[in-house]
Amino acid sequence: MVSSDSSATLEPLRSIHTTNFPAMLNELGISLVVSTYQAGKVVLVRADGESLNTHFRVLQKPMGLAIDETGRMAIGTSSHIWEFRNVPAVAPKVDPQGKHDACFLPRNIHVTGDIDIHEMAWGNDGLWFVNTRFSCLCTQDIDHSFVPRWRSPFVSAYAPEDRCHLNGLEMVDGMPKYVTALGTTDTAGGWRENKARGGVLMDVPTSEVIAAGLSMPHSPRWYGDRLWVLESGEGSLATVDVATGKINPVAKLPGFTRGIDFCGPLAFIGLSQVRESAVFSGIPLTERLTERTCGVWVVNINSGQIVAFLKFEDAVQEIFAVQVLKGIQFPELFVEENEFLKTSYVLPDTALAEVHVADIPLSEAEQCFHNGLQAYHAGNLQEAAQHYRKGLDISPHQMNARYHLGIILVDLQEWAAGIHHLKQVVAERSDHAEAHNSLGVAYINLKDNNNAQWHFERAITLNPQYETARKNLDVLQQLSL
């Protein structure tokens, strides 16, 4: 029997979705990036045939996301800002090869300290972010934790006291234009006293309040010549009349609405369950619904109708940010050290123009890997294994070659040898779901059911839509009866 801790990890990242969600992503040519600070994950939501693939990456309390059309991505975490860059040339090399159309690699990690970072956005002069703990909008530079650029007139000083719970940010023409806050208070945590109806939507350039009396507003957005806001305490999506401040509800949803992005007539909205705690007690949503949902809901903004949803189960209970990746359908995001970070180089265009690559042959180790792939696809497993071994003798840190050698050895029923190589793969790349699944296959054939179950469950945790691993786990459980 597995321990209770191990069995508890079997289902934490499961999700269900409407059948039209994958087709909708395919038709729009998009994927989604979702942050869940409560679960400590960034989720890539990708269509995979007729299924939806939710691909999880681990970061410490990820919240704000900022993505632009040049391939830059920034993620705010508990005390850092991670900056990534899409490196398209790496994407075809990521396992399974030929499936990915984008690969985001880290370029910079900036230490902010614990500032409770909320929404972020790229602007004309770099990255802007909401510093909720110090109640201000900030930019960054290399010498400072953060550079305060704006605070509301009702906040009298910079202090790590979360005086008004500034949270949402929208840019217009490359500069901050709209923000949301949960109160207009100037004392430590003062917004909590009237959280149900103390929220405001503000104009940044004028520092004027556009709309007041809102219930925990988040995520202001300017889209389609209209100002949108999520009135989270109501669980609603609404438009705002900029001249009068009137709120016009468009849709009410079964959760705490926070995080939104648009594509065409569709809004992709994050929903959170919200805990029964002092923070969320007494808001309209908890009075309207005894049970709330966590996931991504898709709303037609013209009709207000819900057209699709992705619902997270078990451990994922709160969503912060939702971003659409336009023109990218199957992205990868690396946050851990791996061979791609060691061997991928991004250069300025001026330098790239002087890089000579046309006559550079494959290295001997790369040629061995290439020969191994050819032999494998031709069904010559022993020959493929020889090529992979030769390449690993030259370059022992080729994890792709070691993984392929491991699965060949499992196919050849050389269980112990396969386990030896696959364990090295997961030691280097702990998120390699396919390697964990192959380890499970090897262990089940060695009658080591405990280890087999652990690796199948680990593969499913890493990729909840990994049907092969689920089927293998079902077989194992049947054998254990």
Give residue spans per PLM region.
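Alpha-helical protein-protein interaction scaffolds
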Residues: 434, 438-441
